[in-house]
């Protein structure tokens, strides 16, 4: 069974549904459970017993989230024995759990929140700094879907950077001793012309 942790507020945002859809395309018979982030606790995850855990993107800037409601997910990020993959805002959530900073890529106009912020969006090139692990079997430069205004500003302790591009420096990272991975892009939004995201998900599911 696969667990998707839904990081959206009030169900705004399509990331959890898109991750589920991609996983069902890869394995039509797979069992998937989606749980709201505020309902996550170590005990609940232990009862569910997933083989892999996915952290979805978020729908609002992280400062609008109640820290107490994120505590359960942070505990899972730090201690879960299962492989964990944070997608887009899920990578940022991993960074926050380990004390790193998340902020806008750049502000290019007036406004508050995401208004006036630089957004990386569309199929973009990302340069891999490793072709092992979840990036096994891929070329040194991949094409994946991006849609974000925030980014991880500094690597958390015990993490290494595994991908980059010119717009947003930390495009992927992984823990040095635990199976915890983050990608700033959306591997679930793959198609026949852009298959690299599918390979990433397939590699993760083999861990």
Residue ranges and their predicted role:
Residues 20-86, 98:
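Flexible gly/pro-rich beta->alpha loop and the following alpha-helix that scaffold active-site loops
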Residues 5-7, 37, 89:
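Cofactor-binding loop segments of dinucleotide-utilizing enzymes, especially the Rossmann-like FAD-
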Residues 2-27:
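Short, charged N-terminal beta->alpha structural module
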């Amino acid at each position: 069974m696969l667990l998707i942790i839904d990081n959206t507020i009030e169900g705004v945002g399509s990331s959890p549904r898109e991750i589920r859809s991609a996983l069902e395309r890869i394995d039509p018979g797979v069992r998937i459970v989606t749980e709201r982030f505020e309902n996550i606790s170590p005990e609940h995850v232990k009862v569910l017993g997933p083989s892999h855990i996915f952290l979805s993107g978020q729908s609002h800037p992280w400062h609008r989230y109640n820290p107490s409601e994120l505590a359960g997910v942070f505990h899972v990020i730090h201690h879960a024995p299962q492989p964990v993959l944070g997608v887009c805002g899920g990578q940022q959530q991993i960074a926050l759990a380990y004390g790193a900073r998340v902020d806008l890529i750049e502000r290019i106009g007036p406004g508050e929140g995401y208004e006036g912020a630089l957004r990386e969006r569309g199929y973009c090139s990302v340069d891999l700094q490793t072709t092992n692990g979840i990036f096994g079997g891929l070329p040194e430069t991949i094409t994946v879907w991006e849609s974000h205004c925030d980014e991880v500003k500094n690597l958390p302790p015990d993490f290494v950077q595994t991908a980059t591009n010119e717009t947003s420096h930390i495009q992927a990272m992984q823990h040095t001793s635990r199976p915890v991975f983050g990608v700033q892009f959306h591997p679930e939004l793959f198609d026949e012309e852009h298959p690299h995201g599918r390979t990433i998900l397939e590699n993760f599911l083999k861990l």
